[in-house]
Regions:
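Short beta-strand/loop segment at the start of cytosolic alpha/beta domains
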Residues: 1-18
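Amphipathic alpha-helical interaction surfaces in cytosolic regulatory modules
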Residues: 19-92
Length: 93
């Protein structure tokens, strides 16, 4: 299960999606909808991964697709390890 909370950041002109649980299976499609619906026209999108406990291949592919356009914060050690290839691939460019 994945819980997705939305917090607008009026001062910064962006928004934060806070995730709790597993980014996997059907929840990846739900996350994509939330991301597309909440992505600001102007400003930055931040995704808070503090309470993410698992990311499957579909979840990693989603983060790989959006990573250049978002800031990922508060990664647990587990999530950070799973996302290392995504971050390395984009930071190397």
């Amino acid at each position: 299960m994945l819980r997705i909370s939305y917090e607008p950041q009026r001062a910064a002109g962006g928004s934060v999606l806070k995730l709790e649980g597993q980014v996997s299976g059907r929840w990846v499609a739900e996350l994509r909808r939330a991301y597309d619906d909440r992505r600001p026209a102007v400003g930055a999108m931040t995704i808070d991964l503090r309470d993410v406990t698992f990311i499957d291949r579909a979840g990693i592919a989603f983060f790989d697709e959006i990573y250049p356009d978002v800031t990922l914060i508060n990664c647990s050690l587990f999530a950070a390890e799973q996302l290392k290839p995504v971050i390395a691939r984009h930071d190397a460019v």
